[in-house]
Amino acid sequence: MAHALYLRGEYGRSLGMAENALIMKQGSYPISELFLHLSASMACMSLKDIDAAKAHFGAAWDIARPDGLIELIGEHHGLLQGLIEACLKTQYPDDFARIIEITYRFSYGWRRIHNPDSGEDVADDLTTTEFTMAMLACRGWTNAE
């Protein structure tokens, strides 16, 4: 539900849903926790709360890295709005490269479904970093941010 709220632009509610689910969990559920932290990161970025976004992304990374559960991170590259680059590119270059490869494969498949269904033609000639910068600019972020 947190992801659905995010997609509807209800970022505050999305964040609240994800954080409440994380607080109320009983036991360890790594896949669910990973997804909830990524959803919270996405919402925080849309709310321009970068510190909270990085904290949730860091928690997601702590869950994902030991077991190589990076597929979800790669699939959410665009929605994470630069967090992968900011948090992993320098400190974890090999993992970053693997995530970006996942992102390219996921995006290729997504465009093959999205373009015919929507009647729009989403371009594929930007790098992941260029795409992130363009998306942040479209959302009103400044270069300094």
Protein language model annotation of sequence segments:
Residues M1-H3, F35, M42, E75, ...:
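Residue register of alpha-helical TPR repeats
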Residues L15-Q26, A59-L69:
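Amphipathic alpha-helical segments of tetratricopeptide repeats
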Residues I31-S32:
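Residue signature of alpha-solenoid helical repeat architecture, marking inter-repeat boundaries
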Residues H114-E145:
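Helix-turn-helix DNA-binding segment
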